[in-house]
Amino acid sequence: MNQTNKGEGQTAPQKESMGQILWQLTRPHTLTASFVPVLLGTVLAMFYVKVDLLLFLAMLFSCLWIQIATNLFNEYYDFKRGLDTAESVGIGGAIVRHGMKPKTILQLALASYGIAILLGVYICASSSWWLALIGLVGMAIGYLYTGGPLPIAYTPFGELFSGICMGSVFVLISFFIQTDKINMQSILISIPIAILVGAINLSNNIRDIEEDKKGGRKTLAILMGHKGAVTLLAASFAVAYIWVVGLVITGAASPWLFVVFLSVPKPVQAVKGFVQNEMPMNMIVAMKSTAQTNTFFGFLLSIGLLISYFR
């Protein structure tokens, strides 16, 4: 008599390849927080100089490697502090799900910083060595976000640091290395991107409220509660779009920048997703919509600038 194996007819879950594991470690849905500011700062520079493509690429990949390193430090230190489990949502999961050694994650983070430094040397040699100081401070903040005795991620200031460092600063450095200057227009253009990068961080913290409470964190989302944090997220989206209206009305930017309003469905989707759900797993779509808001907003802002440049 033939015996039927338990679970026969069910498809066994496929084991992820090392490439897939490493890709998830980078937290790819967050990487637009680096790409968008660099693109925007470079497009704005076109109004003043002929853009150096190699400098643009060096800046882009340097910023990406810094962000990847920050995400890896996050993975390492959250595990070390006992915050990550196999059931945790939104993590790379290389340690708790795939058995990768914590030491390997730390080595990958340091290697990512090493690549960023090499690219930074080229950027500084082509522009200004003062940027080396800014870069080192940025990398220190990336490490201290989850490392050190009082990680930034454990405080209410995570959104502020990420918004300024990965939003405004990335835009301004990208503009500076092409033009050798920072002006009021570049500062004003960088503000909505800073707000939206901070919003990505806020959306992560909204999802992680309960887990972060257990880990002793005091994030802005925890202090405000789910409803208050979602209200702040919605207000952040609104301010970013209103800021563009202000730039156009005051003559600081072309009316073509109104093209950013084509991205409005994404923040609406994000806010609805957070309002309707409080379970971490059910907030993934809302989180992705928040990241996509930054992506689409930044791309459309760049397109608006490009159209006004060529007209």
UniProtKB/Swiss-Prot annotation:
GO terms for cellular component: plasma membrane. Pfam families: UbiA. GO terms for molecular function: 1,4-dihydroxy-2-naphthoate polyprenyltransferase activity; prenyltransferase activity. The chain crosses the membrane at residues 31-51, 53-73, 104-126, 131-153, 157-177, 182-202, 220-240, 242-262, 290-310. Keywords: Cell membrane, Membrane, Menaquinone biosynthesis, Transferase, Transmembrane, Transmembrane helix. Its EC number is 2.5.1.74. It is an enzyme of class 2 (transferase). It is found in: Cell membrane. Belongs to the MenA family. Type 1 subfamily. Conversion of 1,4-dihydroxy-2-naphthoate (DHNA) to demethylmenaquinone (DMK). This is 1,4-dihydroxy-2-naphthoate octaprenyltransferase. The gene is menA.
